[in-house]
């Protein structure tokens, strides 16, 4: 894991000192710059930046919400007999912590998707949802979304992250042993895979620098460029973002927590959208992690 539990803690202890240096450099040399973070553990990285330089203009971007919007679009196509539903047309209210984020509302062109999602789960819980021509066992990052489905049945909201991340927050249920992981049909990224992936990336970087390979400019599905355009005043964008809860966008979490909600991006401005309260059950699941973030940061 890279967010919660022992794996998240160790990664945080490695990463926080580097983010202290980054925050100090921004404070000293570019205090008015916008800082976009994509590094995990997301909440702690953003929290460190603000801890060192409270006036920093920083936010964290994560694509897990996009993946859940895509899942809802695909389920809606199957259940409603529609085609070509764009991920961007799935309107959601986002609230939670990064990688433990939830939707309490989701719709497509005015159609409430909660009943649609519920019906799909009732009829496909055991096999889950597998994308076309993609066997979950063949991919490190694949999942059949059964953890999401189980959490929906337990708590009534849509968990909006990959199953391998959601499982980090509830290890006794989903990470008990390899057999348990296999039964929930999600993959884990191993140390061996990470090392091999890094090797491939470094080799590719060398080829790009030498000119042996050309840079291919293709859309990645991330929204970073759109957000930069909005901050430059060229457009207005609403997207999910990780920033401190200082505006009380989630009232029943501490204002010191870094939370994930929607926000409005416009010229030199990020305005968090009021997301509302978490249910008490889900809040109790999150509070230990909020407290852990405080402890990890202050123990450095």
Give the predicted meaning of each segment.
Residues 80-300:
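Long, compositionally biased stretches enriched for glycine and/or charged residues
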Residues 38-109, 114:
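Rossmann-fold dinucleotide-binding core
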Residues 25-34, 51-57:
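Short, surface-exposed connector motifs at secondary-structure boundaries
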Residues 7-14, 33-37, 56, 60, ...:
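Conserved aromatic-histidine-acidic binding/catalytic patches
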Residues 1-32:
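Rossmann-like NAD(P)-binding element
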Residues 13-16, 20, 39-43, 62, ...:
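Conserved structured core elements
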